[in-house]
């Protein structure tokens, strides 16, 4: 019953209706939402009247210090981790029945395609020792990594770059990952369903090209300047001020 603003963090907006989340707005008297999903995607699943702010959190700077030098990392394979589906017909038919909000294929279509390539090393979210705060240690083992989500950008995009990986990231009109501010060929390599094999093979066929290390370093610098928890905290403070000093 305290008269204080209620700020709510949100991740998967597309399950708002299937999980009955919208009524929570009135129940908990939520004033504002924040998260890393693009604003248009949030309002596609929540009423336009709900206030939302994009804040990119997840990279804790101290976990990305003392990086393994790029030259000493694995370069024969490209790392891809996290949830993924399968491409066989039976799996895809079963997946369709889940609906868009819970469809692995809808969320991870390109990631699923990437892991079928022979030079991509794939590990699921928990099938390794490098979980939670140790995830950066897994990333630091590899020169390159893949960050792909077909509906919106996820934390992997800025975790991978923070770890000094040359990051192949899915950036399309649909997933609106351009909101992160990365630039293709400068601090990341943009991929999509049409060009991913070509882009990934360009690295595998010439892994010692100095341009890769330069792009990786640029990606790390951009992330540590714009996409860390320190920056996110400042953004949250500014959001709080809007309500405290109104």
Task: Pin down the residues of each PLM region.
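Nucleotide-sugar donor-binding catalytic core of glycosyltransferases
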Residues: 1, 5-159, 166-180, 230, ...
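CheY-like receiver
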Residues: 138, 199-203, 239
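Residue-level signal for the nucleotide or nucleotide-sugar donor/cofactor binding architecture
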Residues: 155, 191-194, 227
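Short, surface-exposed helix/turn micro-motifs that flank interaction/cofactor sites
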Residues: 161-162, 220
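A short acidic/histidine/glycine-rich donor-binding loop in glycosyltransferase catalytic cores
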Residues: 184-191
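C-terminal "capping" alpha-helix adjacent to the active site of nucleotide-linked donor transferases
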Residues: 192-211
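A charged, aromatic-enriched C-terminal amphipathic alpha-helix characteristic of glycosyltransferases
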Residues: 207-241
């Amino acid at each position: 019953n305290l008269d204080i603003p209620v700020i709510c963090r949100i991740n998967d907006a597309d399950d708002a209706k299937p999980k009955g989340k919208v009524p929570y707005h009135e129940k908990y008297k939520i004033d504002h939402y924040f998260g890393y999903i693009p604003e248009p995607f949030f309002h596609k699943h929540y009423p336009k009247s709900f206030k939302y702010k994009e804040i990119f959190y997840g990279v804790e700077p101290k976990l990305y210090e003392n990086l393994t030098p790029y030259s000493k990392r694995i370069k024969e394979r490209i790392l891809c981790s996290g949830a993924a589906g399968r491409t066989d017909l039976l799996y895809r038919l079963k997946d369709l029945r889940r609906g868009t909000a819970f469809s692995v294929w809808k969320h991870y279509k390109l990631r699923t395609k990437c892991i079928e390539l022979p030079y991509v090393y794939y590990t699921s979210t928990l099938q390794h020792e490098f979980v939670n705060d140790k995830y950066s240690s897994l990333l630091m083992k590899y020169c390159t990594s893949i960050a792909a989500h077909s509906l919106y950008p996820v934390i992997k995009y800025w975790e991978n770059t923070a770890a000094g990986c040359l990051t192949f990231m899915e950036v399309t009109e649909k997933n609106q990952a351009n909101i992160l501010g990365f630039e293709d060929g400068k601090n990341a390599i943009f991929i999509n369903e049409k060009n991913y094999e070509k882009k990934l093979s360009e690295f595998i066929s010439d892994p010692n090209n100095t341009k890769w290390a330069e792009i990786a370093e640029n990606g790390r610098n951009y992330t540590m300047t714009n996409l860390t928890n320190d920056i996110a905290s400042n953004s949250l403070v500014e959001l709080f001020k809007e309500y405290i000093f109104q």
